[in-house]
Amino acid sequence: MPKLINYPHLASMAFGQPLYATQDVLAGVKSLLLPRMLGNHRDIMAADELPDGFEPAPLEAKGEFKNRIGGLAVIPVHGILMARRGHIDTTCTELTSYEWVRMQIATALADERVKEIVLDINSGGGMAVGCKELAEYIYSKRSVKPITALVNFAAYSAAYFIAAACTKVVVSETGGCGSVGVIMEHMEVSKWEQEVGLTFTTFYRGERKKDGTPHEPLSEGAMAAIDHRMDQAYNLFVSSVARYRGLPAEQVQATEAALFSGSEAVANGLADELANPQDYLNALAASVANQGKPQQSVGFRAKAIELQNQL
């Protein structure tokens, strides 16, 4: 039976939470949520076309990599980044969870056929929750096998948090990196509730329990608490990128969450190399192939082209 998207659940992740996301990502989520939450949009119930918890799965039945070019494992990191898997509807944008990416990396690390790992990144970011944990996992494993962040073509905010933790960051000239910052929006609907005749009475214990409620304007205490959470999330992002990239924290903070083109990202120390994603993947596949059986390198390059066209 078809199921509607759980919009209240999505709203709880989009509003009142620190996000490592660009303004465009947040605007896109709001354009999906707000009309539906206010009853101004009718959904096409097509959620049954995709199974619960659906995500792209480059795993073979026996736990080995499907998206593999010889000794090279390619893991897509696309769309809005979330902490855990959830329902996906055909009206939604592409979603990828941190736990799913970690699972793919773990599988690639355990696969003896895989010599190097590539994260194929095209994302404007997403949730702050879970992002640091994935980045730390990547950072701790890059000494086991090289992990390259191939920015194809965007690695902003949470996506850049992940990319920075990799062994190497490669970006195209027309691609971009950055947005090292945090954003949060609070949705207050008390005036709308008055207009439609809704009244909510909240019973609670603990003075801070209803901080951030959408049914009334933010109190000074609630705003102070939000500012504290934002400072924590921002400082964590800045200090982590500085450690991963070997940069002074002041230099990372001085970017002021700007979005940089490929060449600007390299110049500012956020990326290591400027390259066409297709060409880089082909060359890396050939290099990995040459470490084992040089005569197969042409075949691996052809496989790289085929795989890249699927990403």
Predicted segment positions?
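N-terminal organellar transit peptides
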Residues: 1-311
